[in-house]
Design a protein with these regions (language model features):
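Second-shell loop/turn segments in exported
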Residues: 15-23, 39-49, 76-79, 117-128, ...
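Loop/turn elements at helix/coil->beta-strand transitions in domains of secreted/extracellular proteins
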Residues: 31, 98-102, 147-152, 178-182, ...
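Acidic/histidine-rich catalytic neighborhood of metal-dependent amide-processing enzymes
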Residues: 84-87, 118-208
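N-terminal capping segment at the start of a domain
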Residues: 16-18, 22-53, 65, 184-191
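Sec-exported extracytoplasmic/periplasmic mature domains
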Residues: 34-42, 59-68, 91, 137-147, ...
């Protein structure tokens, strides 16, 4: 919700928080988080293939909503420790070469299963199914409008192993001379902050002028 206001403020779109809330289906939010954090996905670790099952669900969701991949397919494949892994990357509207780009992302992976016991699965509802559902639903909302910038969305692999997925996508986008204006990453937003509802905490403040643009 906050991000849509941020982007709208950058481009002059008149969208109130109440108007945006009315278009976000909370039942869909709960459903997606429940699926991504279910025991059947085994903590979304690529070693036990839980990540691949989660990715299959996300890609099916994107296809069902007529969303287009940024590249030829949704999977942005890279190799980690000689094992194939991939980010999931898509775009809002048509991507135009040379145009400034905003990247909105979150990591899809989690830490899998640890030890043996009745509750040994790290389900990762907050870390980071909450961030993933935000990216999915924000993308759907933004697709209703036309923007002056490219908007790319991504769910990253292997964040828990050292930001490997986002690193590989950043390296690829730099090689392709994609002109990134802002990168906004959602992490563990499933719990309300003590400072109040609809408040966010922005890290990397000193790395860009995003806060000044919003204000």
């Amino acid at each position: 919700l906050i991000l849509t206001l941020m982007i709208s403020s950058c481009y002059g779109e008149k969208n109130s928080l109440a108007a945006i809330k009315s278009q976000i289906k909370i039942n869909d939010t709960k459903k997606i988080i429940s699926i991504l954090s279910s025991d059947s996905l085994m903590g979304r670790d690529n070693k036990n293939k839980g990540y691949f099952k989660a990715a299959d669900y996300v890609i099916k969701y994107l296809k069902n909503n007529n969303i287009n991949p940024l590249y030829n397919e949704f999977k942005d494949i890279f190799y980690s420790d000689s094992i194939e892994s991939f980010n999931i990357v898509w775009t809002v509207g048509k991507f135009l070469d040379g145009r400034k780009t905003i990247l909105i992302g979150a990591h899809l992976d989690h830490i899998g299963i640890s030890g043996v016991g009745a509750d040994s699965i790290y389900n990762g509802a907050n870390d980071n199914a909450s961030g993933c559902v935000s990216v999915l639903q924000i993308g759907s909302f933004l697709s209703q409008y036309k923007w002056d910038y490219n908007i790319v969305l991504a769910l990253f692999a292997e964040e828990e192993k050292g930001l490997r997925g986002s690193y590989n996508l950043a390296k690829r986008m730099k090689k392709e001379s994609i002109n990134l204006k802002y990168v906004i990453n959602f992490e563990m937003i499933g719990k309300e902050m003590q400072i109040g509802e609809n408040k966010v905490y922005l890290t990397g403040y000193e790395m860009s002028n995003l806060a000044q643009e919003i204000n």
